């Protein structure tokens, strides 16, 4: 039970986002006693992934969170004369301007329920009503652990798939509503007809596109794993290197991004980026191929030839490209699809650096620089939580912390008081930014991220192979607006049901998410209508469902901006608007070195045969019964193994 928690730890981590989870894993691995809590009912915070009904429940939760604020003054009675309290926020204000639209046919029936649900899900066309019906089914389902990486086969030895999961209080066991592995729940094979569990990898084209209804989306809701934040992993990025170094990669599987796309003059086209792609491309003339290869070769070595770009350091990368004898076609590809930088704000050096990073990541695991975790980005925080739990970390979801207790004389935080009034002592405190109160953050200036999540019935660029994972950059059109990043996921990524695509749009906010992103949605997709459903000649993919929201970007905020934080309280930011995860890893390593300055950051775990258990250790051992994961019967055959074919980049 939560009220039986130990009262003394070395590190208390509040929030289960990616940076916090990495720090928790690193501290636990170095021998620290770690308590990891989250007031939410799911892992990941704003890095989480949800099934469709789980997402509707999340929307309802935010609606209720904005309407009702509960005050608990129990903690005030425990503050001594030589202490003062820093209250924490009980209201999450990181999500704003939520708008939901359903375009799919809403032929709902009373008996429509999510596949595998224990209770009927009476769907409705409004998100709030749908969430209410889905909540009972969603919260009754436990996400299973992620099994080790495999490639070429979806059969995994039983002993390999027994990965320890975070030890938790009973709140955790009935609360993990993120729906990561509910797609592969073993109950599906016994409770559902076999035709409801299609194979995940099927590249054969369907002769005729079937009409997709909202009822189908609800029923197949567990096939969806919808990320709140849309990012990819650079194959030579800091996160991939950390996953390999720490051996946390065995808890996850990945899929290559198969296409880099460009949107130019109203048309979506594929961008050749590797040497083989360039010379096999039919879009480029032979002269353009030579120009492009010459320029890309220079970009890889640009730091060795400073005289080539020194005169343009004060100009934008776009202006610099115009001086490099590149055709307008090539300039567009390099600027928007390879460097993925702004036409008006990115300087020459930043553009060259981004291009070099892109090119260096080519070929490590595929023909593009990027990987995507199967079942969504929300897997990544859970992988590191699993590592923390293996080394004794204790986990409690739905467990809020009321305040930090600060010693007036030393000005250091000495304890926290939780929702049950229990005082828990610790030496160090890691807290995610969203838990800080308005008083603590009164001087902080936050940016915002505009996000859209779409369910569509086809790809933005049709090819013979339907299982494509694509990234597309749409440049800004108006002064003051920002370019939009589009990531399109197929069903083999285990993020959507067969016959649909899950599309994420992201940009820095200038207005509300809908105002920022709707123009791009209208260019790429056609809203679903009954008439067009019968028309097989529709050029654009049809939009079935859309969600818009703004998310707070708390990255790159100086510690000095927070009011009166004790020196042993460390703040982690939420997701940023960048494509990769490097910021989260840098932040986690920096904070870890402040806590454990002489320790290695997330080293590989020792060989099990070399582990000697200390009977007097205060680290709690994870019970065997709590670490047996459910096996995943739907692992795609074409997943990628994170090995170490070459030395990780520095």
Swiss-Prot record:
The keyword Cytoplasm applies. Residues 156-208, 603-650 are annotated as: Disordered. The keyword Cytoplasm applies. Keywords: Cytoplasm, GTPase activation. Coiled coil: none annotated. It is found in: Cytoplasm, Cytosol. Residues 616-634 have a biased composition (Polar residues). Most abundant in the heart, brain, and spleen. Lower levels seen in the lung, liver, muscle and kidney. Extremely low levels seen in the testis. One of its GO terms (cellular component) is nucleus. Residues 177-190 have a biased composition (Basic and acidic residues). Its main location: cytoplasm. One of its GO terms (molecular function) is protein-containing complex binding. It holds the Pfam family RAE1_2_domI_C. It comes from the Eukaryota. GO terms for biological process: blood vessel development; intracellular protein transport; protein geranylgeranylation; protein targeting to membrane; small GTPase-mediated signal transduction; vesicle-mediated transport. Belongs to the Rab GDI family. Substrate-binding subunit of the Rab geranylgeranyltransferase (GGTase) complex. Binds unprenylated Rab proteins and presents the substrate peptide to the catalytic component B composed of RABGGTA and RABGGTB, and remains bound to it after the geranylgeranyl transfer reaction. The component A is thought to be regenerated by transferring its prenylated Rab back to the donor membrane. Monomer. Heterotrimer composed of RABGGTA, RABGGTB and CHM; within this trimer, RABGGTA and RABGGTB form the catalytic component B, while CHM (component A) mediates Rab protein binding. Can associate with the Rab GGTase dimer (RGGT or component B) prior to Rab protein binding; the association is stabilized by geranylgeranyl pyrophosphate (GGpp). The CHM:RGGT:Rab complex is destabilized by GGpp. Interacts with RAB1A, RAB1B, RAB7A and RAB27A and mediates their prenylation. Interacts with RAB5A. This is Rab proteins geranylgeranyltransferase component A 1. It comes from Rattus norvegicus (Rat). The gene is Chm.
């Amino acid at each position: 039970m939560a009220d039986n928690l130990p009262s003394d730890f070395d590190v208390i981590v509040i929030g289960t986002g990616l940076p916090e989870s990495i720090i928790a894993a690193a501290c636990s691995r170095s021998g620290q006693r770690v308590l990891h809590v989250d007031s939410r009912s799911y892992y990941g915070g704003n890095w989480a992934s949800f099934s469709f009904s789980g997402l509707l429940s999340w929307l309802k939760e935010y609606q209720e969170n904005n309407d009702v604020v509960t005050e608990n003054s129990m903690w005030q009675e425990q503050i001594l004369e030589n202490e003062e309290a820093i209250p924490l926020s009980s209201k999450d204000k990181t999500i704003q301007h939520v708008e939901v639209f359903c375009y799919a046919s809403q032929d709902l029936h009373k008996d429509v329920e999510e596949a595998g649900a224990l209770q009927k899900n009476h769907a409705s066309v409004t998100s709030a009503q749908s969430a209410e019906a889905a909540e009972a089914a969603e919260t009754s389902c436990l996400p299973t652990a992620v099994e080790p990486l495999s490639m070429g086969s979806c059969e995994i030895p039983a002993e390999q798939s027994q990965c320890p999961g975070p030890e938790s209080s009973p709140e955790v066991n009935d609360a993990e509503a993120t729906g990561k592995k509910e797609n592969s729940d073993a109950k599906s094979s016994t409770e559902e007809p076999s035709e409801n569990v299609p194979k995940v990898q099927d590249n054969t084209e369907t002769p005729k596109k079937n009409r997709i209804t909202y009822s189908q989306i609800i029923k197949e809701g567990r096939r969806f794993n919808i990320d709140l934040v849309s990012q990819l992993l650079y194959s030579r990025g800091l996160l991939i290197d950390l996953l390999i170094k720490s051996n946390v990669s065995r808890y996850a599987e990945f899929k290559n991004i198969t296409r880099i796309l460009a949107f130019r003059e109203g048309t979506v086209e594929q961008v050749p980026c590797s040497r083989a792609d360039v010379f096999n491309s039919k879009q480029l003339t032979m002269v353009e191929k030579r120009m492009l290869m010459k320029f890309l070769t220079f970009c890889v070595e640009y730091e060795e030839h400073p005289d080539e770009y020194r005169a343009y350091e004060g100009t934008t990368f776009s202006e610099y490209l115009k001086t490099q004898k590149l055709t307008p076609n090539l300039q567009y590809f390099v600027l928007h699809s390879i460097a993925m930088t702004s036409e008006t704000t990115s300087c020459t050096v930043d553009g060259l650096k981004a291009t070099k990073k892109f090119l260096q990541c080519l070929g490590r695991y595929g023909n593009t620089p990027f990987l995507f975790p199967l079942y969504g980005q929300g897997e990544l925080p859970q992988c590191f939580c699993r590592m923390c739990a293996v080394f004794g970390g204790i986990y409690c979801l739905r467990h809020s912390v009321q305040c930090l207790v600060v010693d007036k004389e030393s000005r250091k935080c000495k304890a926290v008081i939780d929702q049950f009034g229990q005082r828990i002592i610790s030496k160090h405190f890691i807290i995610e930014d969203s838990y800080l109160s308005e008083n603590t953050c009164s001087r902080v200036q936050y940016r915002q991220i505009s996000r859209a999540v779409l369910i569509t019935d086809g790809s933005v660029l049709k090819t013979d192979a339907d299982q494509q994972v694509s990234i597309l950059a749409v440049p800004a059109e108006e002064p003051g607006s920002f370019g939009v990043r589009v990531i399109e996921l197929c069903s083999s990524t285990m993020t959507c049901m067969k016959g649909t695509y899950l599309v994420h749009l992201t940009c820095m906010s200038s207005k509300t998410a809908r105002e920022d992103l709707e123009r791009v949605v209208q260019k790429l997709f056609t809203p679903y209508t009954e008439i067009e459903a019968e028309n097989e000649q529709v050029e654009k993919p049809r939009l079935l469902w859309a969600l818009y929201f703004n998310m707070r970007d708390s990255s790159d905020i100086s510690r000095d901006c927070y009011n009166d934080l004790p020196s042993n309280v460390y703040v982690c930011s939420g997701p940023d608007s960048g494509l990769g995860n490097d910021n989260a890893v840098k932040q986690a390593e920096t904070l870890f070195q402040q806590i454990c300055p002489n320790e290695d950051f997330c080293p590989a775990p020792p060989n099990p045969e070399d582990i000697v258990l200390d009977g007097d250790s205060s680290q709690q051992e994870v019970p065997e019964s709590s670490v047996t994961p459910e096996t995943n019967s739907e692992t795609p055959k074409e997943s990628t193994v994170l090995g170490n074919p070459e030395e990780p980049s520095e």
